[in-house]
Design a protein with these regions (language model features):
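Small-molecule kinase domains that catalyze NTP-dependent phosphoryl transfer to phosphate-bearing small molecules
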Residues: 93, 122-123, 143, 147-194, ...
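Hydrophobic anchor at the beta1->P-loop junction of P-loop NTPases
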Residues: 6
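The conserved Walker
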Residues: 10
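ATP-dependent NMP and nucleoside kinases share a basic, alpha-helical "lid"
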Residues: 94-103, 107-144
């Protein structure tokens, strides 16, 4: 099964674009959804986070508001949190891929925000970056989502610059225009992906 790493900075429309690949029989794994699941259900990880970030465990779950407040005061602790979360999400990711292989899906879109930052491109067959202009990104994140501007800048500081991501990607999808335009780009890329020979699973996972 072909493994496609799809990434993009915050506010680029990454997850919306990833979901479009479902129309072309690709399975979609969402790393952010996995993190949310872990915060609410994975007791081992919840307790590890509580040890590193006292007070983050509220009613048996990780409080994202508490974490957000702590990280906004001390952005350097992003790395500490990631060191706990990323190994856990990787195990969930591998489990998902195995399930999709059993279902004989033609490919799996791995929607991973920090694909390049964590070296994840080594473990996929193809990388796709979703991009948009700085103005569009700001509009979505600040005006539509209501994210604090300082926190937005702190998140960006943890992510690889958009231009560098685009340069490293095998394919780039722009979400500057309307949804129909993005969908056409997805259709074009999906048609190319189905012709590729899967290698990443056997090379890096199935050992």
């Amino acid at each position: 099964m072909l493994l496609v790493g799809l990434t993009g900075s915050i506010g680029m429309g990454k997850s919306t674009t990833a979901s479009m690949f479902k129309d072309y029989k690709f399975a979609v794994y969402n790393a952010d959804d996995t993190v949310h699941y872990i915060y609410e259900n994975d007791e081992i990880i919840i307790n590890k986070i509580e040890q590193s970030f006292p007070g983050s465990k509220v009613d048996g779950k990780v409080s994202r508001d508490v974490l957000k407040n702590e990280l906004s005061k001390n952005p350097k602790r992003f790395k500490e949190l990631e060191s706990i979360i990323h190994p856990a999400t990787r195990q969930y990711q591998i489990s998902f891929i195995k399930q999709m292989i059993e279902k004989e899906r033609i490919g799996c879109i791995l929607d991973i925000p920090l694909l390049f930052e964590t070296g994840g491109e080594k473990y996929v067959d193809v990388s796709v970056v979703v991009t948009a202009s700085k103005e569009t990104q700001y509009q979505r994140v600040i005006n539509e989502r209501g994210l604090d501007a300082d926190l937005f800048e702190q998140i960006l500081a943890q992510q690889m610059p958009d231009q560098e991501k685009c340069e490293r990607a095998d394919y780039v999808i722009s979400t500057n225009n309307n949804m129909d335009s993005t969908r056409k780009e997805v259709e074009n890329i999906a048609g190319k992906l189905v012709l590729l020979e899967p290698k990443a699973w056997n090379d890096y996972y199935n050992k």
